[in-house]
Structures are given as C-alpha cells and as structure tokens.
C-alpha cells in the first residue's frame, strides 16, 4: 500500500446550539500512512475528539461540517449516507474508545461482544465466528481465550477489557484504527502492554492508527507524526521526534514544560522528612475481604510507613496493589483486619461513632473524579459549605464568608459559588473538591489519583496549587497515584505496593534513582516518554517561560 490511509484536508466543524455557532475544529489537515501512527495531541476542548468523531461519521446532531474533506484511501467519507458509513465502521475503520467499562455491555459475555462485530456485517457462520473470536483473544494476548470468552466485563481487569475492545476493533482487519485516549485510565505497566499491542498490530498488518491523546509522553513514545491542537486549530505538525525535540509553537513548548518529568523536581519549602515529627504512622496494616467458599482476599498485607508533618508521602502501584485501600484506612473509611494506623496521636483503628465523625475534621479525602464526588444538583457554594453545616460550625453569614475565602484560596472566582459542577471545567471542579476538603481545616489530605484524569497543563496547575497550600497551611499529604513522574514532582517519600505488599519504601530521590526492588524498576521502565529526553523537555520549558 502507498499513499495516505487517511487524508484530512481543511476540515472545519461547527456546533450550532441555541446560544449560537461554535467552531470546534478549524481548518485542520493531517494524514495517516499505512502502518504509521499519527498522534493528535491537545487538552480538553482542543477539538481532537470531535475530529475523531468526524472520521467515524459519529458527530452529534448539533455538529455541522462547514468545509473540508476526509478521505479513507480513495473514498470521500463526508456526505456518505449513514447506511454506507455503518458498513465502513468496523470493516475499514476500527475504534478503540477510552473507557472499556462503559463501552462493553455488562450483561453480555466478552466473546459475544466481539462476535457482534461479525454479525453486524452479515456473517452468520456461528462456528467460524467462534473460531475467529478465540483467535482474536489470543492475538491480543489474553490467556485461556475459551474461558475468557465466556466471562463478563466485570470479571476482567481494566487492561484485559481494553484488549477485548482492541480485538473488536481489529476483527475485520480495518485499514484504520481510531484510538481515542485508549490508555488514559490505565496504570503505566498495563498502558505499555496495550500500546505495544496497538503498535505491533499496526506494523504487522499495515493498519494506520490515529492516536488521540492528551499525553505527550505517549505521543513521544508511539507516534511517527504529531499534530498539536488548541482551540480547534493546528498549532504545530510534523515528525514526532522533531516536534517534541524542537517545538516551534509556543503552545507546544508550554505543554512540554507542564509535562511531569522524572528528572525534575518542583522546589518546595517544606520540613525535612527525615527530621520532622511523624504525623501519620502505619504499622503492619492488613486488610482482608471475605469470599464465599474460598480463602479471604488479602487486599493489603503488612504495609508500614510514616509520614512527617508537613510533607508528602506517595503510595504508588498498579490497579489492585492496595494503595487505595491503604489510603482509605488512613482516612478512617476502612477498618483494618490487623495492624495500626495513627494520625496526630489518634489511634484511627480504635475509633467509632462520634470519635470517628470528629476524625473527619483531621483527615479529608480528595477523589479522582470530582464530578462524581460532587452532587450535580448542588451549587458549588452549597457543596463547599455542607461540611460546616454538618458539624454545626458558624451561622449563615459566617459560612458564606468562609465559602468565599475557600474559593479564593484555591484561586477560583467567588462568583462560581452560584454555578453547578457540570458548568465548570475539570480543573475548576478539582479545585472545588480541594476547597471543600479544606473547609474544616484538616491536618491531612488523602489525595486519591487527584490529578490523573486532568490534562497536562491543568494537572501542572493543580500540583502547583497543592504545593502552595502545603507551604501556607502546613498540610500533610498522602498522595495515591500510578503516575511515577507526578509522584517525582510532588512527593518527599514513597511506598511502592504490588499485590497488597510493600516492595519498597524510602525517600523519592533514592527510590527513583537507585531502586532496590525489581517491581519498582519495572514500573519505572514502563513509563512512556523515553523517546525524547528530559533535557529536551527542560529546554522547551525554559523557552516557554522566557
């Protein structure tokens, strides 16, 4: 095959609503060659997902293609009737979506989900379909395909579910795969495995890949060409190695400067973790869950660490490593099976009733998804005020004044108090969640993947906010994350967990530069972004801040 598999020229897409016309994609051109990966990089609202929807013929009703061309080989896609587009989806264009849990039917086995791809395209040979399903599951690296084909999505890990979606996407050997944030919800080791799979499938079969991502490190590792979008317009395009090593657009330099790096640390004036008194002490923590007819499942097994007052301790590991269970035990939401948790001299494991309720004023949780943790029917101001009402603190006027103070403290306009969560951006919602957590003046924040769902620029802003709040308020953080580059920037000490056990703990500098455990080394090796070095990113950051 020669030429471009996908050729987009001068594409403009508008959204027409009651409020008027909004241009989501503005005069965008790009190409994807056979066996090549083109990465479409940008923040939320950059237009990258709208462009992907346009390629698939899945634009929402409010969207209008104002101008341009989308060609798949020699076929012009724009203007094709829906019936024709349906035959192309799956057969010539495959989709790997972001959320495997939301994309798979929970009441259908994974084998049936893959088989549906064949049936939709007219294949009725059940024996042949079953053989192909098992072949596909084996091809994407799923062990024991016959057993897995009979399982339901909830019985598979996130990485396995994403492999099932890839199997569906390649079932009919399409010319093009649109991979829309295919690994943003996955841990680094699973992410590497899934990206390796997409990469190898493309190279083996000559399939082109349009990789939609906000992760520059993923683009650096996997793409042949990069297109950087902002506000629907192309800021920069070219070979990935050139764009990321020598960016010409100011916006690209800003993205590179904001990307977390394993070799750089954000300087923070905080107490020395070695000499400051321990505020959090966890000793021999164990948490079991009973299982009918089987041995208990051990989620956390003999985890111990201390966190000095005013410092940040990170819990790092893959899904199922026990890091969230450990964090919830510190926050008082999980009672350990064995071991002790002490915070500011309080034995958390002995608390119940009123004592446990009062403990909520000492430790607060900040979750990964603020949209899920904030009541969508409750205005922002009311959400921040709610903990004060629950504890009977202050009158209405004093609470309103405190809400204004909290919004200002997290660098939000107090006028946002009258908005609903859905009316805010992801970064604004996370700031609201932090403001709500701080309204009771806690000593400790447990931050559970608090920045993992955010674009790189917004993520950098939230990390800077957390560093400032720690310095101003003397806060102690327990920072739960699967992103080691982020941990490198914010944490003083770290515990690496695997399958419930602590495999390594110590100062971040030592653990990351001279890891003692093979598990830690594997986590570090799986981090994307080795295609361009941190020195280049530093140079880009220097240029961006001049």
Residue ranges and their predicted role:
Residues 77-94, 120, 126, 242-247, ...:
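ABC ATPase NBD coupling module
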Residues 173, 441:
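Conserved catalytic motifs of ABC-family nucleotide-binding domains
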Residues 75, 128-147, 398-415, 524:
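Conserved ABC ATPase "signature" region
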Residues 56, 60, 331:
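Helix-to-loop junction immediately C-terminal to a conserved catalytic motif
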Residues 151-156, 160, 420-424, 428:
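Conserved ABC ATPase signature
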Residues 64-76, 339-347:
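Conserved ABC transporter NBD signature motif
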């Amino acid at each position: 095959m020669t030429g471009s598999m996908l050729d987009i020229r001068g594409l403009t897409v508008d959204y027409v609503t009651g409020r008027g016309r909004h241009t989501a994609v503005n005069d965008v051109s790009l190409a994807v060659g056979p066996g090549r990966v083109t990465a479409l990089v940008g923040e939320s609202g950059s237009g990258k997902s709208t462009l992907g929807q346009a390629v698939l013929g899945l634009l929402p009703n409010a969207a209008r293609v104002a101008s341009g061309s989308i060609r798949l080989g020699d076929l012009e896609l724009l203007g094709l009737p829906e019936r024709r587009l349906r035959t192309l989806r799956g057969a010539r264009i495959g989709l790997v979506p972001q959320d495997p849990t939301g994309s798979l039917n929970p009441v259908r086995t994974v084998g049936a989900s893959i088989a549906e791809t064949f049936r939709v395209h007219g294949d009725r040979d059940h024996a042949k379909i079953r053989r192909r399903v098992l072949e596909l599951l084996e091809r994407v690296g799923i062990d024991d395909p016959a057993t897995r084909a009979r399982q339901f999505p909830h019985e598979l890990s996130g990485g396995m579910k994403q492999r099932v979606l890839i199997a569906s996407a390649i079932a009919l050997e399409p010319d093009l795969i649109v991979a829309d944030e295919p690994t943003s919800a996955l841990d680094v080791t699973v992410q590497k495995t899934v990206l390796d799979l997409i990469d190898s499938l493309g190279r083996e079969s000559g399939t082109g890949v349009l990789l939609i991502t906000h992760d520059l490190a993923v683009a650096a590792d996997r793409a042949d060409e990069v297109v950087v979008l902002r506000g629907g317009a192309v800021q920069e395009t070219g070979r990935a190695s050139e764009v990321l090593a020598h960016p010409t657009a100011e916006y690209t330099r800003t993205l590179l400067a904001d990307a977390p790096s394993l070799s750089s640390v954000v300087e923070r004036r905080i107490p020395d973790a070695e000499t400051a008194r321990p505020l959090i002490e966890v000793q021999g923590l164990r948490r079991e869950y009973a299982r009918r007819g089987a041995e208990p499942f051990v989620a956390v097994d003999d985890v111990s660490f201390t966190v000095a007052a005013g410092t940040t301790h990170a819990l790092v590991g893959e899904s199922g490593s026990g890091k969230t269970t450990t964090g919830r035990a510190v926050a008082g939401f999980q009672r350990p099976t064995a071991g002790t948790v002490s915070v500011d001299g309080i034995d958390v494991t002995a608390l119940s009733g009123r004592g446990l309720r009062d403990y909520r004023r000492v430790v607060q949780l900040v979750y990964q998804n603020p949209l899920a943790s904030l009541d969508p029917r409750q205005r922002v101001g009311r959400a921040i005020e709610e903990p004060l009402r629950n504890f009977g603190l202050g009158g209405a006027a004093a609470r309103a004044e405190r809400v204004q103070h909290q919004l200002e403290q997290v660098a939000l306009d107090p006028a946002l108090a009258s908005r609903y969560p859905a009316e805010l951006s992801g970064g604004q919602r996370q700031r609201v969640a932090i403001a709500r957590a701080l309204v009771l003046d806690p000593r400790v924040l447990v931050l559970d993947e608090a920045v993992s769902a955010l674009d790189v620029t917004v993520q950098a802003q939230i990390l800077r906010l957390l560093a400032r709040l720690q310095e101003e308020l003397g806060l102690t953080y327990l920072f739960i994350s699967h992103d080691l580059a982020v941990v490198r920037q914010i944490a003083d000490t770290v515990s690496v967990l695997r399958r419930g056990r602590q495999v390594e703990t110590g100062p971040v500098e030592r653990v990351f530069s001279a890891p003692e455990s093979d598990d830690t080394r594997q986590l570090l090796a799986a981090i994307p972004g080795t295609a361009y070095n941190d020195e280049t990113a530093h140079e880009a950051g220097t240029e961006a801040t001049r």
